[in-house]
Structure formats: structure tokens, C-alpha cells
Regions:
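Domain-scale activation on soluble regions of proteins
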Residues: 1-203
Length: 203
């Protein structure tokens, strides 16, 4: 058995990013499901796996938002298919703001009730993203146990933990992860569909 990297690129150079989005999403979901379905509670395993679960899920969110932003930049002809399509930014909240400002343009043909429902859903999603962003704004929080102010240039820096004591309800985490996955997969699929329609007509 073997894995391949960049063996396919896709018409818009989207394939490798697609695989990363899928991979981090599935990795976080499968690890969490492993903990939730275990016959016996293993506290050491829970406390060790929570880090890769949260890191992978946070990175999934960052990637799926960036991928959707890139799709809309292709749709709006702001970029070509051989260009990256999103800025260097790790704050999920800042990325979400960029995406939200674009997706509201899709509401122009919606009726008032549908627009209100979309806005309610957006607010709910934003509140969850704020919570994640407050914990880990720049994608370091679940990669290291300590704050690395100078990126390890001084080995004698005093230890400062990333977080105080945290208790995480795994069932609640699973529920919120599912909500965010369903929401952002829907947004991403919508952007892919719009882009596909535009490029099909062009051909």
C-alpha cells in the first residue's frame, strides 16, 4: 500500500486542498468517535487524544473556509486557477468575516424568511467560531503545551502553559463539531456548484 501527494491537481488546482480538508475533518471525527464509543473509559487516552482532535478540527475549519474563499475568488474572477486565492491568515474569525461578507451576496434572490433563517444560522456559527478563536487564535494552542513566545530561541524561557485547567464535554464537542461540519460543507459545496456552472457554460 502507498499514498500519493499531488498525483492529481484538478482543473482549478483544487485537489490537494480538497484532500487536506477531507483528511483533517475525518481525522478529528474518527478520533473523537473512538473515544465516545469505547467500551471502557481510558482517561489517559482521552487526555492525550483531545489535543490532536482539537488541532485537526480547528485546522479543518481554517482550510475549509480558505477553500471556500478561494472558490468565490475564482467565481468573481479575482484570481486565476494557478493562483493561491487566499491571504496568509490563521485567525478563524477573520477568515469567517471575509467569507460571510461574500456569501451574503448570495441572499439577493432569497425571500425574507429564508434570509432571516440564514442570518440566524450565521450568528450561531459565528458564536461557536468566537469560542474556538478565543481559545486558539493562531493555531498554536493545541500543537504545544507551553506558550512559545520567542519560538524556542531561548531554551531557558520560563514555562507558561497555553491553557489553565480545561474540562471538555466530549458529547457536546461532538454535537458542535457536527453542526460546524454540516454548515461549512454546505457552503463549500455551494461554491463548488456555482463555480462548476460558470466554467461549464464558459466551455
Amino acid at each position: 500500500d502507498y499514498a500519493t501527494i499531488n498525483s492529481q491537481k484538478g482543473i482549478n488546482n483544487e485537489h490537494s486542498l480538497f484532500l487536506l480538508v477531507e483528511g483533517y475533518r475525518d481525522a478529528s471525527s474518527k478520533l473523537l468517535n473512538e473515544l465516545l464509543t469505547a467500551e471502557k473509559v481510558d482517561w489517559l487516552k482521552i487526555d492525550s487524544l483531545i489535543y490532536p482532535i482539537l488541532f485537526s478540527f480547528r485546522h479543518y475549519l481554517e482550510l475549509v473556509i480558505k477553500d471556500t474563499i478561494r472558490n468565490y475568488n475564482l467565481i468573481d474572477k479575482k484570481i486565476n486557477s494557478d493562483e493561491i486565492g487566499f491571504k496568509k491568515e490563521h485567525s478563524i474569525l477573520k477568515l469567517w468575516t471575509l467569507l460571510k461578507n461574500r456569501i451574503v451576496e448570495n441572499y439577493e434572490g432569497y425571500d425574507k424568511e429564508t434570509i432571516q433563517q440564514c442570518e440566524i444560522e450565521n450568528t450561531s456559527v459565528e458564536n461557536m467560531l468566537i469560542e474556538i478563536n478565543n481559545l486558539d487564535e493562531f493555531s498554536f494552542g493545541f500543537r504545544y503545551p507551553f506558550q512559545i513566545v520567542d519560538y524556542g530561541k531561548n531554551i531557558n524561557s520560563k514555562i507558561v502553559y497555553m491553557f489553565g485547567e480545561l474540562k471538555i464535554d466530549l458529547n457536546n464537542l461532538n454535537e458542535n463539531m457536527s453542526k460546524l461540519i454540516n454548515y461549512f460543507e454546505g457552503l463549500n459545496c455551494q461554491s463548488v456548484h456555482i463555480l462548476d456552472e460558470i466554467q461549464t457554460v464558459k466551455e
